[in-house]
Amino acid sequence: MSSSDRDIIDIESGEEDLYSDGGNDIIDIESGEEDLYSDGGNVSDDYNPVDDTISRSEKSYVVVKEEDILKLQRDDIEQVSTVLSVSQVESIVLLLHYHWCVSKLEDEWFTDEERIRKTVGILKEPVVDVNGTEVDIQCGICFESYTRKEIARVSCGHPYCKTCWTGYITTKIEDGPGCLRVKCPEPSCYAVVGQDMIDEVTEKKDKDKYYRYFLRSYVEDGKKMKWCPSPGCEYAVEFGVNGSSSYDVSCLCSYKFCWNCCEDAHSPVDCETVSKWLLKNKDESENMNWILAKTKPCPKCKRPIEKNTGCNHMSCSAPCRHYFCWACLQPLSDHKACNAFKADNEDETKRKRAKDAIDRYTHFYERWAFNQSSRLKAMSDLEKWQSVELKQLSDIQSTPETQLSFTVDAWLQIIECRRVLKWTYAYGYYILSQERNKRVFARTFSLSCCSAEAENGLERLHHCAEEELKQFIGKIEDPSKNFGELRAKLIDLTKATKTYFENLVKALENGLVDVAYNESQSIEEPESFTKRSKTRKIKTLI
């Protein structure tokens, strides 16, 4: 089965890994030396793309460990070697050239084998005589004479001593992943250097580095896998599309990211909006907007001047020294009063527009940044809760930690909701940046209503987890506090908040065209938290 046709397995965060932890004592394919590939090891032999398949109504992806990547590589190498009747070393060269796309390789090979051989550097016959009778052979690099055993060649037959081969290949490995496609040292020769030569002449540390590049090439050169961007994580994610617009995936290291752009998970906001927003946060253009909004140019030298006192009599700094009125920008020497109405000139209009743009951007950015910092704080609180405080609560309440998992669920829900809420402000910023028409105002109103409901629910949940729950941790417990009531309250708030945000995400994914909580979607809140109606209805203006 080719890599391009391989099925993808669905995975949900928190479930057990789909692969076994088989041994990784791997034997070289041909030489028998230790290497990354073998039939002798049992690296994830239970890997089965059919097992544990979840409904295709959700996005399909699978988190893959390095040993599983090795097995997938080995399977592709063996398939190509069998189908094309070439050695496994040549299979590796071909797969690297075709970026591990087995189907494309096989199609083009059977269409024009000779052209493919020449393109990748696999020669059928050497270009120099390798069957001579001379005892000593001159190295093509150092020009010293060596015995046949001290000389090594690739398919072209050009002779080089093993010492020169070692230096040549080691230099290529130190240069980076380009070492996977090393050619013969002869400048005019296009013959490729295979893994058999790498194994023969390189030291262990260089060989390990080479095979590290080789392993990573399966993910980085292909189109279906990407490495988890979390620092230190060695998992990759294989992805398949089933019609959903979200690319968010959850790695086994617990890091959630967008598979498409490799930024933090940002559903339901699309990658383009995220890219524009992050770029805007770094863009120096906001500095120019601030200058336009908060300063006026000196009428004489045109340098921007910020007014920092109450008086309208302004003096430009040296060497200009121009005196003028801040209100009307006229020289003070012939200035009487500037209380007559004057229509805004072009510069004043620009300043007002710049100030409006800054105020609008600041409004959304502050809320985006607040939810980001709140999310990071919640992640820190969860870590502290799981490592210290959960055990304290378990001891105080004489309850197993497994029965207190609802507290962890609450914190996880808070973290996820902060993430979603953060990106709604980036989404909202670009809605208001569009043409002012009825549809845009309707979408803005819908977003405001949905996010307000969700944010209010989140704040109540966050307060309960951060303040009320922690009141039950300490050396002395207030007997007036009823932990059972808090348990029910926290569970209800977690469910209600989850429903709010599911509706918000659905509304954003649908473009806020159909935003309504009907009777079947009513959200019931704990009576202790609100006196308002338990059923809310939101309708758009569209």
Curated annotation (Swiss-Prot):
One of its GO terms (biological process) is protein ubiquitination. InterPro entries: Ariadne (IPR045840), E3_UB_ligase_RBR (IPR031127), IBR_dom (IPR002867), TRIAD_supradom (IPR044066), Znf_RING (IPR001841), Znf_RING/FYVE/PHD (IPR013083), Znf_RING_CS (IPR017907). Zn(2+) 6 binds at residues 325, 328, 335, 338. GO terms for molecular function: ubiquitin-protein transferase activity; zinc ion binding. Pathway: Protein modification; protein ubiquitination. A zinc finger (RING-type) spans 139-189, 298-328. It holds the Pfam family Ariadne. Zn(2+) 5 binds at residues 298, 301, 316, 320. Zn(2+) 1 binds at residues 139, 142, 161, 164. Zn(2+) 3 binds at residues 228, 233, 251, 253. Its cofactor is Zn(2+). Binds 4 Zn(2+) ions per subunit. The keyword Metal-binding applies. It is an enzyme of class 2 (transferase). Residues 135-342 are annotated as: TRIAD supradomain. Zn(2+) 2 binds at residues 156, 158, 184, 189. A zinc finger (IBR-type) spans 208-271. Keywords: Metal-binding, Repeat, Transferase, Ubl conjugation pathway, Zinc, Zinc-finger. Its EC number is 2.3.2.31. The active site is at 311. Might act as an E3 ubiquitin-protein ligase, or as part of E3 complex, which accepts ubiquitin from specific E2 ubiquitin-conjugating enzymes and then transfers it to substrates. Members of the RBR family are atypical E3 ligases. They interact with the E2 conjugating enzyme UBE2L3 and function like HECT-type E3 enzymes: they bind E2s via the first RING-type zinc finger, but require an obligate trans-thiolation step during the ubiquitin transfer, requiring a conserved active site Cys residue in the second RING-type zinc finger. The active site probably forms a thioester intermediate with ubiquitin taken from the active-site cysteine of the E2 before ultimately transferring it to a Lys residue on the substrate. PANTHER family: RBR FAMILY RING FINGER AND IBR DOMAIN-CONTAINING (PTHR11685). Belongs to the RBR family. Ariadne subfamily. This is Probable E3 ubiquitin-protein ligase ARI11. The lineage of its organism: Eukaryota, Viridiplantae, Streptophyta, Embryophyta, Tracheophyta. The gene is ARI11.
